[in-house]
Amino acid sequence: MKRFLTAGAACLAMASAVHTQALAQDAPADAPKPMDLPRDWSATLTQDATGLHDIMIDSHPGVHDPLNPAFKPRLEEGLTVALERAKTTTDAGGWWWALRAYVASFEDGHVGISITQPNYGFPTRWPGFLTVYRGADQVVADREPADAATPPLGARLIDCDGVAAEALAEQRIGQFRGRWFLEAQRTLYGDWQFLSAQNPWIGEMRQCRFEADGATKTYALNWRATPEDIYARRAKLAQRAATDFGLKHFDDGGFWISTPSFNGDPSSETLAELTALIADMKTKQDALRAAPYVVLDLRGNGGGSSHWSQLMAQVLWGDAWMAAHPEPAIEAVEWRASDGNIAEISAFLDKLRATNGQPELIAWAEDAINGMKAAHAAGQVYWRSANDEKPADAAPPPPAPQLMAGRVYVLTDSSCGSACLDAVDLWKTAGALQVGRETSADTVYMEIREPVLPSGLAQIAVPMKVYRGRARGNNEPQRPQYIIAGDMSDDAALLAAIRRLQPD
């Protein structure tokens, strides 16, 4: 069976990222920043929304996807909305949030947008408190302690200006982030409910009702600039782990392996750290296989290349076990054969060759380039790379010994997406137990590149290929067998919770 690699966003978005960095480095240090220069923001939105639309038409595999007839109408409807908003856009906030809404309308974590000016952010306002999701409820999790006019910690939001809490979150957050049906999105962005960042397409609420200790009270909101420590406050609420790559061995014989990224960019520090981690795992292979438990920590891992999770599986379970317990085969991968996509993979291949990249990745890139070029020359929309069909009389793989003496736990949080999801798919098929929190999710559109929009102020993420016959469906998260409540950044508490899951 052919194994389809995902080289990942971090690898393949190089060309545009390098171009953007070069532009920033060429500018004099005291030159005005692009986002601060006066401009016609209405015309800029029209230009960039049209450019976004045209890039998608040219290169996104969904445009001609017979299994997704809603894609093209959604693309056109999003442009119509953005162009209508351009008629009344007067500032950078109107431009940015209209484009964010257009991108969010695709309901795809692999379609994204970012501002090219490094570290740019819009000034924010708040009413003196923030809410986050706790299950289905939005509760006050941070407030100015000196402001008696704000709801108490733990108070549950009921509604604002007559709009129910969940509908309000969909309007204020989901409209601009997308995939609001996912628990991970609400976990990651729920604190935006009571933040205002120069978004003219939503207003600032005037009054809200909260329930605390069985009593409901109405609060008038006093919006003002956020305090200087707002980012630290939000980081504390997010409970996101700041993990490093590494392999820890505990006194009870257990192991903890942390992989906060699968970035496969040949020039990245992450590549060196992943390479060193795999080498360390190979050195300790016998001890890992004899351990009472091994924790594969994926907290904070937003993806990269699926190559690394395959290597880790080989070290732990071995090739024979993986062959005897295969994932459901993907039928095929279809690449959108466009000039832009061919150029992106060609740039990636050049970088791989220049850095003596892994032969498997080089062969993968060469195959994709040659296939897309042939399809493009023949006037075909896609180049199809089909999986090898098993003969009807093919014998099943022979039984293989289970080399892992103890349990393998895969620890996930809401950040897990793309190649991180591929890792969860693979490791659970091999026998790992998922613990922690529900992951994010992706669609079957994969392998992004990041072209810059016409204004030069933003760049978008555009998938280049589509999976056919993937077992995990569109926007389907991985849900843990064992949910671990509490702070997902508390390593000691997580280890204690996992140890309690161990069989007696």
Region spans (language model):
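C-terminal segment of classical bacterial N-terminal signal peptides
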Residues: M14-A22
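Flexible, low-complexity junctional segments that flank or bridge functional domains
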Residues: A24-K351, R407-Y409, D422, G436-A461, ...
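Extended, charge-rich low-complexity interaction segments
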Residues: R353-G371, M464-A485
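Flexible, glycine-rich surface segments
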Residues: N370-A432, G436, M446-E447
